[in-house]
């Protein structure tokens, strides 16, 4: 179909799960010409994030900036989590927006634009294999969302209040999507959800993610993959073993523990324990060439100095390859919202101390890759002189990047899988030479 003589600027905020929904909207708006310049766009579509306070502020500021910069007659649309979470008041709070829609109508965005109407469907949208997507950012990597929503009841998290309960895709639908994406050239994928390790729990199956790994292995279409967002209480030694034994899934373990102290885990309503965390983490560490990422929250209400010191000592001892550190964010409709807060000054001091630990071990993780062959994915050209790549175990964007100098190559590189040797690194960037494709 011929493209309309109209330009679309889509701004996707927040997580990779949001990005998949943004790509579905691009699939519905394929007849628009894409632009990164909001000032020249005829439609500005902002897929918002409403997870924590800083994300909400970023979404609001992005909307206000677009409203200020847009040309006369441009349609300004706010979709996604922020719109959904505050749907009852957001129309009055941000009147500059022409169309509001939440997390249930990504596949109807073309209709909403045509009718210029707001819509908030009750059912949370979950992309299926038949939903056309425009994959962004890479010609060889794609995200695959396996479920929506979450059945956990963490004290600090508002996500279930606007994303609903766990809703898993059928395994056959995921396999069909993987097959279709591979035919389009996407040979590396990252499987994502709010709680990936609970995949198919809502359908009465406790080993859903193991089933998925086994089915992908048998399909033999993908070259490489990894899984994000394992939840401790639904992660098992059997799941770790399935990842370890897979020829396709990398030994990449992303499991947000949030804390290590038993008393804090209880306050956070994490439905897990220090002993269970240690059992899983030690099993992950024993996997050959494993890469372990986690997330912690600092300053949750009632976190005392002893609990913080216990966390600090553990993080220094365990040595995560990557660690996200978040300050507690008080969110409406959560158990922790009304509890007595830890002073911000104390939270900031604790974060500073933990950042020092995290950066030390991140530095060592990079250093361990130097001067030895590793498997990597070359994705695209970065500027005029370098190709951008990443360790196959790494997730896109968050774990670092590798640059390959094109002046050291005899022929240009095509996106794909290569064996490389990193020789130096600085500021989360490795410099490497290519040995050969594999």
From Swiss-Prot:
Q: Which InterPro entries match?
A: Elp3/MiaA/NifB-like_rSAM, Methylthiotransferase, Methylthiotransferase_CS, Methylthiotransferase_N, Methylthiotransferase_N_sf, Ribosomal_uS12_MeSTrfase_RimO, rSAM, rSAM_horseshoe
SUPFAM superfamilies xref list = Radical SAM enzymes
Report which residue ranges the record marks as coiled coil.
none
Binding residue positions for [4Fe-4S] cluster 1? 15, 49, 81
Matches recorded under NCBIfam families: 30S ribosomal protein S12 methylthiotransferase RimO (TIGR01125), MiaB/RimO family radical SAM methylthiotransferase (TIGR00089)
* Catalysed conversion reaction: L-aspartate(89)-[ribosomal protein uS12]-hydrogen + (sulfur carrier)-SH + AH2 + 2 S-adenosyl-L-methionine = 3-methylsulfanyl-L-aspartate(89)-[ribosomal protein uS12]-hydrogen + (sulfur carrier)-H + 5'-deoxyadenosine + L-methionine + A + S-adenosyl-L-homocysteine + 2 H(+)
List, for all copies, the residue spans of the domain called MTTase N-terminal: 6-118
GO BP annotation list: tRNA modification
- Enzyme class label: transferase
The gene is: rimO
Protein name, as recorded = Ribosomal protein uS12 methylthiotransferase RimO
**One GO MF term, please?**
aspartic acid methylthiotransferase activity
Q: Which family does it belong to?
A: Belongs to the methylthiotransferase family. RimO subfamily.
Q: Which residues does [4Fe-4S] cluster 2 bind? A: 150, 154, 157
Q: What is the protein's known function?
A: Catalyzes the methylthiolation of an aspartic acid residue of ribosomal protein uS12.
What this protein needs as a cofactor is: [4Fe-4S] cluster
Residues in Radical SAM core domain copies? 136-364
User: What would be one Gene Ontology cellular-component term for the protein?
Assistant: cytosol
